Amino acid sequence: APGLRDIRAAARAMHHILFAHGLSAEAMRSLGTSNIGVVLNLTEAHPASNRPCDVKAKDRLDGIHNRWFLDAIFKGEYPQDILKKLNEFMPENFEDDMSLISESIDWLGINYYTRGIVADDPGEPWPSLKDIEGSMDKTQMGWEIYPEGLKNLLLRVSKNYTGSLPLLVTENGMACADEVQNETVYDPSRIDYIFSHLAAARAAIDEGVNLQGFFYWSLLDNFEWAFGYEKRFGIVHVDFETQKRTPKASFNEWALSLNS
């Protein structure tokens, strides 16, 4: 439930979502499906300072958000530094599930929006993390715009986990307070966001990453979970009263780039 803080429930959910992936992939393979992948929400972790306690906090963030899922799928094990804290909350005999979780896949999708900067917060329960606001420009969601993090993640995942396996950027985008004026929407910050992240992806390809696709989030303004219709990610504006669609300037720039 929203707002619930239960480490036992969290540990089991983190395992069971991976086990569900393994069961689903097994079932699809048995039906002859040959193009199976999984999408992970990854965050490049940064320490708030060079203090050892903050560096360790960064490692905890990375372990929970990134390595827990990557290690399970590609190595058949959970990162020991995180498992050491979560082991007592895990399902009985969870180790028996790891071979299924780590069955081979045909591609990996990565959702990337921003980096995470954390400091150690010893007054909080484990993982004792305090989010720190970055210095770069922010989206309407309050997320720092950090395209370098996408390149770094692609390089790291390719080097440490996937090798030549195809990668896809399955989500990347920003929310803006878009308004229609004179039958158009001018969104230069989104244009900058899109092309800076495309440049980061291109740089990763140039360094050997087998990146096969890039999907912007999203084509249309839509319902954004707890934020409802307030946060607009689309490159096409939607009037939610009339359902009228208005392509934004970013839509036109994207189309031009695809045709050039």
Segments predicted by a language model, with ranges:
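Active-site region of glycoside hydrolase catalytic domains
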Residues: 1-260
